[in-house]
From Swiss-Prot:
SUPFAM superfamilies found in the cross-reference section: PP2C-like (SSF81606)
Gene: PLL2
Lineage: Eukaryota, Viridiplantae, Streptophyta, Embryophyta, Tracheophyta
Binding site for Mn(2+) 1: 282-283
Protein EC: 3.1.3.16
Residues bearing the modification Phosphoserine: 125
Tissue: Expressed at low level in seedlings, roots, leaves, stems, young inflorescences, flowers and siliques.
Enzyme class: hydrolase
Textual note on the cofactor: Binds 2 magnesium or manganese ions per subunit.
Binding site for Mn(2+) 2: 282, 593, 656
Record-given protein name: Probable protein phosphatase 2C 66
């Protein structure tokens, strides 16, 4: 997201692309550019995945529909040192990483540094055009690590040497290779052959060092840090590795954490319980807020949800049971599945009625139309069998997410308040939050800020008014020049977007009206399309100087705003949504706002659908990032390589940090960040 104060005025005026690239040492700028990682969920006995033609619901299936995770990370902002107030070097897994991009994970994830294809190299496999004619441009490979063949997702990759601890039944058989993807396969094979050690589920990238976290409540074991910059050998032995894997086995999760500039991404997968957690934290004005979210929000969510979506006795000691009272949540019905969709609701709709001191927030309706109730009440079931055959109240799950976020921000502000005199910059730091929890066919989304969760689904092109509404949805985010082709695509059953969360930014008139209504005495509450002339987002985690006068007073005079009254200008009140998946839903794109500097919702869905059609085994998330870079380069008169030759920091003038996760609802997940 970057610092909201910075303004761009003629940064490229009169500058030739070649002159830009010649100012930098090309041999250094790709060092720490980003990383790729991959994960495949082991085959579990008795699991039957639904076919694309059949509805996702099945009473005997308790497993999620995701299958694998892959992606990449590229940063636009440089690495910024933590203030030192919220975490010491030993607490922060990224404190030792000089690079703007870093990655750490449990052993079942594998990662590689991300490198662009050299200029004029034969490594490039394109242009390759989709036979259907879809897509804005021919698909060309710009990175050495993608598209990725599905057989390379599993980690560790099959080896001739096996330890007694390995479980062959959990290792997926590799399909036959395709020549277009041999590059990535070769890179992985070389790494495995050079680092073939008898360690169970060892990451193919050797760690730089371990993070000796002092937080006893942290869920994860000591992390394996993978930086794109360093080639140092780690300090680890078999006993330490066995200890880590033993702890990971007890906690029964696989996890990955990545950073790209000021973006942070957190993925947690429970292989046995069948759920996936994804957090995207788009920071601004510094790294402390997104780092704090990365280290604490998932743990808070896990504590609040224990007893709702799962009831693991091994984890119960980590926190209290998060059961809460039923909140207000108007229900919608999907005519196709007969199951409830809980629309986007706001924080204050879910809290107990006794919380009178909370600022009154605007109530809004879902941005998609309300659907009529065509099913009998026997089919309209809000509850679903959980992992322990206990009913799940979706409203309570959403409330648990909200409580976890509230407690995390309260702890962050309390800790920062103790250090604000020594570190006044903490009052400026904040982050957007996008959290998605997926279990089976239930998807829960919590959002604060301008990140988006966009579902790609087949339109239900019925007759009459409903057909017209489906077609109107296509026009929603499309530019004028794209409307004709997109509408024609809809007539051919091209996927259409469904945004599951409300965006909290000054682009949304409801948000602007709310802030002005809460500050009638301040004519500059929203100025130059920014809250107090500073932030485009109208809700955020942290950013205390826009929430309380005391935080604003702690800043240096040059950074202070004219704070009028005592009411907060922004809040951390999230939008919450529960969506029940159906056979029409094909994939879900989770992204920070950087993606939508160059894409509309429809264009992003259209691009992913087109790419998957051309490369069923490819990485659509990395492809979206590549397209962002191509569009940014074209906008400023550069080519792909010239843009990447500009170092982080300077490159922020052309594009933002972008984090993208594409979850395929037909068996795969792809993840990328930039």
């Amino acid at each position: 997201m970057g610092n909201g104060v910075t303004t761009l005025t003629g940064c490229c005026t009169g500058t030739l692309a070649g002159e830009i690239s010649r100012r930098y040492d090309v041999s250094l700028v790709h060092d720490g550019l980003g990383h790729s990682f991959c994960y495949i969920r082991p085959d579990l006995p008795g699991v039957v995945l639904p076919s694309p033609e059949s509805p996702l619901r099945s009473d005997h299936i308790q497993e999620t529909t995701f299958r694998s995770i892959s992606g990449a990370s590229v940063s636009a902002n440089p690495s910024t040192a933590l203030s030192g107030a919220l975490s010491s070097d030993s607490d922060c897994p990224y404190s030792s990483a000089v690079s703007a991009s870093a990655f750490e994970s449990s052993g079942n994830f594998a990662s590689l540094p991300l490198q662009p294809v050299p200029r004029g190299s034969t490594w490039q496999s394109g242009p390759i055009v989709n036979e259907s004619g879809l897509g804005s441009a021919p698909f060309e490979r710009r990175f050495l690590s993608g598209p990725i063949e599905s057989g390379l997702y599993s980690g560790p990759i099959e080896s001739t040497k096996k330890t007694e601890k390995e479980k062959p039944k959990k290792i997926r058989k590799k399909p036959k290779s395709k020549k277009n993807f041999l590059t990535f396969k070769t890179l992985f094979a070389n790494l495995i052959s050079n680092n073939n050690k008898p360690r169970l589920k060892k990451s193919v990238i050797e760690p730089i060092n371990g993070s000796d976290s002092s937080d006893s409540g942290r869920l994860h074991h000591e992390p394996v840090i993978t930086s794109s910059r360093s080639n140092e050998n780690p300090k680890s032995d078999l006993e330490e590795e066995d200890e880590k894997q033993s702890m990971n086995s007890v906690l029964d999760v696989q996890w990955a954490q990545g950073k790209a500039g000021e973006d942070r991404v957190h993925v947690v997968v429970s292989e046995d319980n069948g759920w996936v957690f994804v957090g995207i934290y788009d920071g601004f004005s510094g790294p402390d807020a997104p780092d704090y979210l990365l280290n604490n929000l998932y743990t808070a969510v896990q504590k609040e949800l224990n007893g709702l979506l799962w009831n693991d006795e091994k984890l119960r000691s980590l926190g209290e049971n998060g059961m809460t009272k039923t909140g207000k949540c108007s229900d919608e019905e999907d005519p196709e599945s007969g199951k409830e969709n809980c629309p986007v609701i706001n924080n204050d709709d879910a809290v107990a009625s006794g919380a009178r001191n909370q600022a009154k927030s605007l109530k809004w309706r879902c941005e998609w139309e309300k659907k009529s109730n065509n099913k009998t009440k026997s089919d309209n079931r809000c509850d679903q069998k959980g992992s322990n055959s206990t009913t799940t109240n979706h409203k309570d799950v959403l409330k648990a997410l909200l409580q976890a976020l509230r407690k995390t921000e309260d702890a962050y502000l309390e800790l920062a308040d103790q250090m604000v005199k020594e570190n006044p910059e903490l009052a400026l730091m904040g982050s957007c939050v996008l959290v998605t929890l997926m279990k089976g066919e239930d998807v829960y989304v919590m959002n604060v800020g301008d990140s988006r969760a966009v579902l790609g689904r087949k339109p239900n092109l019925a007759t009459g008014r409903k057909r017209q509404k489906e077609l109107e949805r296509i026009r929603e985010d499309s530019s004028l020049e794209d409307k004709e082709i997109l509408m024609n695509g809809a007539m051919r059953n091209t996927l259409v977007p469904l945004q599951l969360n409300m965006e909290h930014s000054t682009r949304i008139e409801e948000e602007v009206r709310r802030i002005k209504k809460e500050h009638p005495d301040d004519d500059c509450a929203v100025e130059n399309d920014r809250v107090k002339g500073y932030l485009k987002v109208t809700r955020a985690f942290g950013a205390g100087f826009l929430k309380q006068p005391k935080w604003n007073d702690a800043l240096l005079e040059m950074f202070r705003i004219d704070y009028i009254g005592t009411s907060p200008y922004i809040t951390c009140s999230p939008s919450l949504c529960h969506h029940k998946l159906t056979s029409r839903d094909k994939f879900l794109i989770l992204s920070s706002d950087g993606l939508y500097e160059y894409f509309s919702n429809q264009e992003a869905i259209f691009e992913v659908e087109s790419f998957i059609s051309a490369f069923p085994e490819g990485d659509p998330a990395q492809h979206l990032i590549q397209e962002v870079l191509l569009r940014a380069a074209n906008k400023f008169g550069m080519d792909f390589h010239e843009l990447l030759e500009i170092p982080q920091g300077d490159r922020r003038r052309y594009h933002d940090d972008v984090s993208v996760i594409v979850i395929s609802l037909e068996g795969r997940i792809w993840r990328s960040s930039m």
